């Protein structure tokens, strides 16, 4: 589990459905700490108090942490990726009407380490996980476009934003600005 997640917490173990829960692994994780294979500490704010991590994971987190005055780079991850903590170690952000899940084919755009935009499987719907604001939406869409183009996706056709037809929403001009081509019922991005 340490190899898969890098950091293991009570919530991670519960999400994995390990028989006996966290207490069944705690002794082994403590042994790995004594052997120098794992570290125990409080590495990620908001996760449980007892956190065990591989040394490389801790160093990677430190590298990714923005310095004073710097803004964190946006990150697009598969919603089901073990490195994506929402829906496993962390609850999805609560926002009226927002629905997100750890399903194959869906993606999450993280801004500053926080889930901002959920891309449903197939890309037909974009679900904001925080109140929509132009500044962060522009940043999230730019990251999504970069991800789609670098991943070799044939096309991304967005039909809905926040449960509304995309053509009727305030995000359409931002999609066009990001490189999408408007259509009668959707905005399409081709690599």
Language-model segments: which ranges?
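Long, charged, low-complexity, helical-prone intrinsically disordered regions
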Residues: 1-191
